[in-house]
Amino acid sequence: MVKAVAVVRGDSNVKGTVIFEQESESAPTTITYDISGNDPNAKRGFHIHTFGDNTNGCTSAGPHFNPHGTTHGDRTAEVRHVGDLGNIETDAQGNAKGTVTDNLVKLIGPESVIGRTVVVHAGTDDLGKGGNEESLKTGNAGPRPACGVIGISQ
């Protein structure tokens, strides 16, 4: 079992943790998130970006992690970036908590996300269905108010 965590924060009120767990390279990865400080009753883009570099804030994390060179899509879509985790949904207080299981996100092997950055976006991810070029790259999810580098944990 490999475990990893990202402590998410930035130049906003958005903060929280994202925990990753994977049993083996062929097993799916469980992703558990607990994020606060978002707008209430909102959907916010949630992605793994390529770099673990946050020297200039979350913009230094680069584009979505996309080792297969595909277009952007929903977490459950057949064609998507590895880093496309869709949207998190907030409650009336702006908190988002949940767990998803993902077959593309890996902690083990050459496409590991360890050392990369999780980003919570300021807008809703259109899941690649926005009808423009940017939608196929970013889902038009907007600015990056909070992020955290994924690191190995106990």
From Swiss-Prot:
Keywords carried by this UniProt record: Antioxidant, Copper, Cytoplasm, Disulfide bond, Metal-binding, Oxidoreductase, Zinc
UniProt enzyme class: oxidoreductase
Q: Where in the cell is it found?
A: Cytoplasm
Claim: Lipid biosynthesis is one of the keywords in the record: no
What is one term from the GO cellular component aspect held by the record?
superoxide dismutase complex
Task: Please tell me where Cu cation binds in this chain.
Answer: H47, H49, H64, H121
- One GO molecular-function annotation for this sequence? oxidoreductase activity, acting on a sulfur group of donors, oxygen as acceptor
Residue sites binding substrate per the record? R144
List the residue ranges of the region (Disordered): 125-144
- Name what cofactor the protein needs: Cu cation; Zn(2+)
According to its UniProt record, the EC number is 1.15.1.1
Give GO BP annotations, semicolon-separated: cell redox homeostasis; copper ion transport; fungal-type cell wall organization; intracellular copper ion homeostasis; intracellular zinc ion homeostasis; negative regulation of cellular respiration; positive regulation of transcription by RNA polymerase II; protein stabilization
CDD domains documented for this protein: Cu-Zn_Superoxide_Dismutase (cd00305)
**PROSITE patterns to which the protein is assigned, alphabetical:** SOD_CU_ZN_1 (PS00087), SOD_CU_ZN_2 (PS00332)
Cofactor binding note of this UniProt entry:
Binds 1 copper ion per subunit.
To which protein family does this belong? Belongs to the Cu-Zn superoxide dismutase family.
Q: How does it assemble?
A: Homodimer.
Q: Could you identify this protein by its name?
A: Superoxide dismutase [Cu-Zn]
Native organism taxonomy: Eukaryota, Fungi, Dikarya, Ascomycota, Pezizomycotina
**Name of the gene encoding the protein in the UniProt record:** sod-1
